[in-house]
């Protein structure tokens, strides 16, 4: 290692800036990292060399000594060794420590650098919390007008004692001694070398010196949580409302999960929903159906006037514009469809009976049904 030119190892000029050194080291470290070159001793040795070279050149004092005396200033100095020919120096670090320092992973590769090396993510960072589902039943009135509901549910939250770290106050997380912070370890199966999640740290890259006495190192505890949920007008059965970050807490810096509120609308005693339209049936007196008039009908937004034309038949459907459900996606509000059912009196007073008999006598043939299509079609059955 002492005979190598440190600048050449990193591929930079002698006057390279600190940022240029760091950029060059990142590129070389990714190229020669042992995890990217399993079983390749030459790559592993080169990884150690470039790590040692970078550690020397990034330190102004060590770099000055190297520029003056060359590699001889550090003869015998390697990963974990003393400074050798340089007086007053401290020891060198493990090459993996240098790697973690540069890539800022607090004890392991993860996120962007691992994706850069292998095209995917892995352990060494926090674990995201799970998403949760809450089934919420509301009335049709609440679905039409919108509402605000308070819900209560149990979930994993960050431990109050350790603030989610899993470590007892005064203790801390340290680099996992098994995987050296990588979150994975290499295993050999005959001629095949493969990686697997570190059994010591579970892929976190760190372990806890002294677990928290409340959460026992989990970093999370189960608690009952209350949350106010705003329900927008127009929701329907199966509508999902997302409450970002209100799922279960992440572990070791991982993001919280989300909470999904799934809506269920109760059946209504009067209205039936058909998309954004509402349907209802109302009874009217046969005198109103015959003579016509105006009545008030209920809607989800109050009363509305409905004009009944003269001679309205039972089963006739009327449309009240914009009295249906609001559209969840915006746009025009639905309508309310009103089907009338003409009620025939089941009992009559003597006076009422006489009036109807007089009506039947003076009507003659005019009392026959005005719509004869059904009877014409039914003749062949008699």
Curated annotation (Swiss-Prot):
Gene Ontology CC: cytoplasm
What InterPro entries does UniProt report for this protein, alphabetically?
A: DnaJ, DnaJ_C, DnaJ_domain, DnaJ_domain_CS, HSP40/DnaJ_pept-bd, HSP_DnaJ_Cys-rich_dom, HSP_DnaJ_Cys-rich_dom_sf, J_dom_sf
What would you give as a GO molecular function for this chain, any one? Answer: zinc ion binding
Checking CDD domains in the record gives: DnaJ, DnaJ_C, DnaJ_zf
Q: How is the cofactor bound?
A: Binds 2 Zn(2+) ions per monomer.
Q: Where are the zinc fingers (CR-type)?
A: 146-224
Question: Where is this chain primarily localised?
Answer: cytoplasm
Q: Please report the residue spans annotated as repeat (CXXCXGXG motif).
A: 159-166, 176-183, 198-205, 212-219
Stretches assigned to the J domain: 5-70
Q: Which family does it belong to?
A: Belongs to the DnaJ family.
HAMAP family linked to this entry:
DnaJ
Q: What does this protein do?
A: Participates actively in the response to hyperosmotic and heat shock by preventing the aggregation of stress-denatured proteins and by disaggregating proteins, also in an autonomous, DnaK-independent fashion. Unfolded proteins bind initially to DnaJ; upon interaction with the DnaJ-bound protein, DnaK hydrolyzes its bound ATP, resulting in the formation of a stable complex. GrpE releases ADP from DnaK; ATP binding to DnaK triggers the release of the substrate protein, thus completing the reaction cycle.
Q: According to its record, what is known about the domains?
A: The J domain is necessary and sufficient to stimulate DnaK ATPase activity. Zinc center 1 plays an important role in the autonomous, DnaK-independent chaperone activity of DnaJ. Zinc center 2 is essential for interaction with DnaK and for DnaJ activity.
Name of the molecule in the record: Chaperone protein DnaJ
**Source organism:** Opitutus terrae (strain DSM 11246 / JCM 15787 / PB90-1)
- What is the primary gene name for this protein? dnaJ
